[in-house]
From Swiss-Prot:
Name listed for the protein in its UniProt record: RNA-directed RNA polymerase 2a
InterPro entries: Bromoviridae_RdRp, DNA/RNA_pol_sf, RNA-dep_RNA_pol_alsuvir, RNA-dir_pol_PSvirus
Transmembrane spans: none
General function of this protein: RNA-dependent RNA polymerase which replicates the viral genome composed of 3 RNA segments, RNA1, RNA2 and RNA3.
Compositionally biased spans, kind Polar residues: 804-816
CDD domains per the UniProt record, alphabetical: Bromoviridae_RdRp
EC number(s) on file: 2.7.7.48
Species per Swiss-Prot/TrEMBL record: Cucumber mosaic virus (strain FNY) (CMV)
């Protein structure tokens, strides 16, 4: 029996009857709740559940009644009441609903959280029940999809207080918020007065006591150019431009590249930052500390030692032909570097040098792989290649383009070398098994500290003639462009017009790197790699007859070096200079990588020739031993791995974009190269300067965080101080500023000789009275006329030959003239002649010009 609540009145309020529950009322309410709960338990009948786990057989639909109700209870491990519509859905539809509601994180082929059909359907049923249940909390419950995800992941069912505060649109005035005051905003002019130095009462930008570049904490992000003083602005900009760019409070000043004077006031230690001038001595000290064995390296006579010393080598099937060697072509000399960075001289392709290079690059092929079924396994590797890298729809819809235009571009490129359409041979009449061979005159810079014990061996090039390459190169170029268009998004080949190492929206930080170093890559390739390449080329759409023809004359070939007179047969190994060298090496590396590692675990994969680099969130899992046991490669997993490929480091800026930076250690070595030809107008030196500037165009993007990344990667890779890398960047910034700064790194001995001999601007001429031919005729007449054949000379009344020296006196003093004439006359020597009786005597004093026609001055 329910008692009416007491009415509100002053009497009930005073005696405590209104608004207060008496013990009798409390007991009455509890008894009513117990009766209602007992009635609900008596009337409740649970519905049978259906097991929709993986163990359901294919004929599970036959067990259902026509009305769709389950026939029997299979399992009661999960709740299905209210989710019958999801029980009838297929697995694919459930997966789509799972991705929509729960929004799992995909890591390779794994989902986090993992998909469980039973738990997902139970979460849907519980979410529907919770939304229909009466509200017992003042907090806002999540919407249906978010509630399903919260139940599945066992998280909070309600929105956080921050979200509730954002959803509740309440008008709150500034007076209602404690601790805050809101004032009307007014636009300012933006002018900030410059800081004034307390010591000299000058603007701190011009004050010698204040180093503005020493401020580490500034409003904007520091760039690399902030740490170095401008070398000079004379003739670059006028005063008006300088004044408008630097602000109204700065007067036009003449910028000099010099160190500021020592400050007269104390600077706090946290503001101290070195801004010393970069000079040639600093760069040399960096080389000495980073490359200790390179500073005293001089190979000026190393090749002379090799040619003149005893030589012993072990090669099979080598043919030497020393009868028609090509003599060395003399050049005009090379520029001499000021820096000593361990760079070597140009190598000359002599017989011994070529044999040494062939021994290292072409002969002694390693045999590390096991015996396998080549045809079956090569097809499996090629199939894995297409599954891992190629988008099948793009490959089916694409076609060859620009084959003919590539051919015309190739002919125009080499037109200056004498290649014309009339010189193209019939390929069926040519023996394509013969390759020309040569060594690279430029030796790759050595970054290891082994120059004191090891002499670098030059690389070799095996190539066809341009007339043959011009007919294969356009086809393979078009095929490579089609291959790039069909690659998946995470695969990058940094070659061509549509790809590069610049990756927008990808950050290399907080990633695991995988770098595989493949040694002896070219000569380690055998028949297995050739079959893999053939299957991949056919799959990409290359005409099968051309692929078969190309692979046939790569099974057995003969290389010959005409300059050195050396020839030898080779088989299967990669030709380092034909039309498919880069493309073939790239697809072979990609195929080997896909067979040893699951490519789905990587976010980005970069391939270029024999170089490979992968980025993943988790440590990469794979079997690198297959590179050796199956593919006959000497592979080494680089530890610790850093983002390094193609001799470049990959760095990320503050916006999450990745760009490439050349290896500073190799760039410093290139500053001391000895291969720049000499020219009077410095055209070759300027070409090297422009190449240097193009490689270092990244300097404008180097912020302080990028410099810190480079220092860490440099230290991890080379086990050398990372601070040296930052100092190298300072040198690069100076020598890329202008050509005059770059010219400080090189000089020529010819110019020194010209400067030494420049004191004499007069014409120096030697006139001969009696030539050698006249003297011989004179001797023959004397022997014929003189029967006694008496010796003739200064004692016998012979005539002396005189040397006349004519010299204009436009410049120079008379004393210099007399000194030069006396020095010239002092070098005359007696000329020996043959006596009639077999005795030797002295004919007369002759100048050296009559002995051999050469006068030393």
């Amino acid at each position: 029996m329910a008692f009416p609540a007491p009415a509100f009145s002053l009497a009930n309020l005073l005696n405590g009857s209104y608004g207060v529950d008496t013990p009798e009322d409390v007991e009455r309410l509890r008894s009513e709740q117990r009766e209602e709960a007992a009635a609900a338990c008596r009337n409740y009948r649970p519905l049978p559940a259906v097991d929709v786990s993986e163990s359901v057989t294919e004929d599970a639909h036959s067990l259902r009644t026509p009305d769709g109700a389950p026939a029997e209870a299979v399992s009661d491990e999960f709740v299905t009441y209210g989710a019958e519509d999801y029980l009838e859905k297929s697995d694919d539809e459930l997966l789509v609903a799972f991705e929509t509601m729960v929004k799992p994180m995909r890591i390779g082929q794994l989902w986090c959280p993992a998909f469980n059909k039973c738990s997902f359907i139970s979460s849907i049923a519980m979410a529907r029940a919770l939304l229909l249940a009466p509200r017992t909390s003042h907090r806002t419950m999540k919407c249906f999809e978010d509630l399903v995800a919260a139940i599945y992941t066992k998280s909070d069912f309600y929105y956080s207080e921050e979200c509730e505060a954002d959803d509740a649109q309440i008008d709150i005035s500034s007076r209602d918020v404690p601790g805050y005051s809101f004032e009307p905003w007014s636009r300012t002019s933006g002018f900030e007065p410059p800081p004034i130095c307390e010591a000299c009462d000058m603007i701190m930008y011009q004050c010698p006591c204040f180093d503005f570049n020493a401020l580490k904490k500034s409003c904007a992000e520091r760039t690399f150019a902030d740490d170095y003083v401008i070398e000079g602005l004379d003739g670059v900009v006028d005063n008006a431009t300088l004044l408008s760019n630097l602000g109204p409070f700065l007067v036009p000043v003449k910028c000099q590249y010099e160190k500021c004077p020592t400050p007269t006031i104390a600077i706090p230690p946290d503001l101290n930052r070195a801004t010393d001038r970069v000079d040639i001595n600093l760069v040399q000290s960096i080389c000495d500390s980073t490359l200790p064995t390179h500073s005293n390296y001089d190979d000026s006579f190393h090749q002379v030692f090799v040619e003149s010393a005893d030589y012993s080598i072990d090669l099979d099937h080598v043919r030497l032909r020393q009868s028609d060697l090509i003599a060395k072509i003399p050049d005009s000399g090379h520029m001499i570097p000021v820096l000593n960075t361990g760079s070597g001289h140009k190598r000359v392709g002599t017989t011994k040098e070529v044999l040494t290079a062939i021994k290292k690059r072409n002969a002694d092929v390693p045999e590390l792989g096991d015996s396998v079924n080549l045809s079956r396994l090569s097809k499996a590797v090629a199939e894995r290649f297409f599954i891992s890298y190629i988008n099948g729809n793009s490959l089916a819809s694409s076609n060859f383009v620009n084959v003919v235009s590539n051919f015309h571009d190739y002919m125009e490129k080499w037109k200056s070398s004498g290649l014309s359409y009339d010189d193209l041979p019939d390929l069926h009449a040519e023996n394509l098994q013969f390759y020309d061979h040569m060594i690279k005159s430029d030796v790759k810079p050595v970054v290891s500290d082994t120059l004191n014990i090891d002499r670098p061996v030059p690389a070799t090039i095996t190539y066809h003639k341009k007339s043959i390459t011009s007919q294969f190169s356009p086809l393979f170029t078009a095929l490579f462009e089609r291959f790039q268009r069909c690659l998946r998004e995470r695969i990058i080949l940094p070659v061509g017009k549509i790809s590069s190492l610049e990756m927008a929206g990808f950050d290399v930080k907080n990633k695991h790197c995988l770098e595989i170093d493949l040694s002896k890559f070219d000569k380690s390739q055998g028949e297995f790699h050739l079959l893999i390449q053939e299957h991949i080329l056919n799959g990409l759409g290359c005409p099968a007859p051309i692929t078969k023809w190309w692979c046939d004359f790569h099974r057995f070939s003969y290389i010959r070096d005409r300059r050195a007179g050396v020839g030898m047969p080779i088989s299967f190994q990669r030709r380092t200079g034909d039309a498919l060298t880069y493309f073939g090496n790239t697809i072979v590396t990609m195929a080997e990588f896909a067979w040893c590692y699951d490519t789905d675990q990587f976010e980005k994969l970069l391939f270029s020739g024999d170089d490979s680099l992968g980025f993943s969130l988790l440590p990469p899992v794979g079997d690198p031993s297959k590179f050796t046991t199956l593919f006959n490669m000497e592979a080494k997993v680089m530890e610790p791995a850093v983002p390094y490929i193609c001799s470049k480091f990959l760095l990320s800026d503050e916006f999450g974009n990745t760009f490439s930076v050349p290896d500073p250690l190799r760039e410093v070595q290139r500053l001391g190269t000895k291969k720049i030809p000499y020219s009077d107008n410095d055209e070759f030196l300027f070409a090297h300067f422009m190449s240097f500037v193009d490689r270092l165009k990244f300097l404008d993007r180097m912020s302080q965080s990028c410099i810190d990344q480079l220092s860490i990667f440099f230290e991890l890779k080379y086990k050398k101080s990372g601070e040296e890398a930052a100092l190298m960047l300072g040198a690069f910034k100076k020598y890329t500023a202008n050509f005059q700064s770059y010219k400080e790194l090189y000089y020529s001995d010819r110019r020194q000789c010209e400067l030494i001999n420049s004191f004499c601007s007069t014409e120096f001429r030697v006139e001969r009275v009696n030539s050698n031919k006249q003297r011989k005729n004179y001797g023959i007449e004397r022997r014929c006329n003189d029967k006694r054949r008496t010796p003739t000379g200064s004692y016998g009344g012979g005539e002396e030959a005189e040397t006349k020296v004519s010299q204009t006196e436009s410049t120079g003093t008379r004393s210099q003239k007399s000194q030069r004439e006396s020095a010239f006359k002092s070098q005359t020597i007696p000329l020996p002649t043959v006596l009639s009786s077999g005795w030797f005597g002295t004919d007369r004093v002759m100048p050296p010009c009559e002995r051999g026609g050469v006068t030393r001055v």
